[in-house]
Amino acid sequence: MKANKTINLSTKTNLLEQDLYEYKLQDVSQPELFREIFPYNEVPKVSYNYRHVPMDMPEHIYITDTSFRDGQQSREPYTTQQMVDLYKMLHRLGGPNGIVRQTEFFVYSKKDRDALERCMELGYEFPEITTWIRATKSDFELVKNIGIRETGILVSCSDYHIFKKMNLTRKQAMEKYLGVISDAIEAGLHPRCHFEDITRADYYGFVVPFATELMKLSKDSGVPIKIRACDTMGYGISYPGVSLPRSVPGIIYGLKHYAGVPSDMLEWHGHNDFYKAVVNSTTAWLYGCSGVNTSLFGIGERTGNTPLEAMVFEYAQLKGDLNGMDTTVITELAEYYEKEIGYHIPERTPFVGKNFNVTRAGVHADGLLKNEEIYNIFDT
């Protein structure tokens, strides 16, 4: 770390602020696995350091979709026609203001490429069609000439992945990632860097230094570089005062404050292993992240992703209105999954299950007969 004690007036906060430490890559010889937090033979620990960061919700927040990427990794793949049908419904759900802003596609199979091309032919502005690749030269060749503007690039950032999966050092991993990202920029693409396993990563030893390098590359090239903070194992914690690497507020605040990542270049990708996908996604919004990544009905790896429909209603509650989104499409999507895809949605799933607003308790039924507002969440 290099200290700089200059004090300047911030144009963002209108307060005098001391210039920040510049965090440098810590190229350690042994992996940092945070065994005191993740002992593996026990339930992970939630530790506190009582450092609180301010809420800073962006003016514009939006939803992105990974149903055709992460959503397909956990189930029988969709057919080309099913992806086209679902994409049309996502377009209607997101409305004219594009609150459902983007969706991402695999490009490894002919079926996925055909679906991508057919969806592009529809000419919709939203959801913008993007892709996902690994940080390899061969994967990059798959996307550089297919007409998309933005591609996701997998950049695993925890030592679990860098040391144990990829058999690299942190320095080698960063150099590899920066090489592929630079190639994407040279080909005219906007990179979206997926910081895999960020909630088990050495935040100040790798995450912030890497994000800082990406922001330098963005400034030098004039190309926006987005960072998707991926809570790959669902370890993220929303509670104020929780220590890194599990703190969602701390992760978002640090990427903005220490690495200089703008809110509109930040996105959160959550998993539901500890039932926290929705609250962590909302927390990411509240602390400065513009985008939250979701999948239809939360279908995704293991316990799934953040349900898209849940974030539609989180958006409405936080912003005060739907901003053009058409929530009737959510019911159409549920019916399509049941009838056309053959996917069973549990009856008590919020907003989409057949019984989500059904009551069988006698005292509740009595209340509903007297006034339906007593036991209905709103006029659904």
For each feature predicted by the language model, list its residue ranges:
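Alpha/beta enzyme core
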Residues: V53, P58-I63, R75-I99, R118-L122, ...
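Active-site beta-loop-alpha junctions enriched in small/polar residues
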Residues: R69, F106-K110, W132-T136, S156-S158, ...
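N-terminal active-site wall of soluble small-molecule enzyme domains
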Residues: V107-W132, T136-L142
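A mid-to-C-terminal "edge-of-domain" accessory segment
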Residues: I7-L9, T13-R69, D321-T380
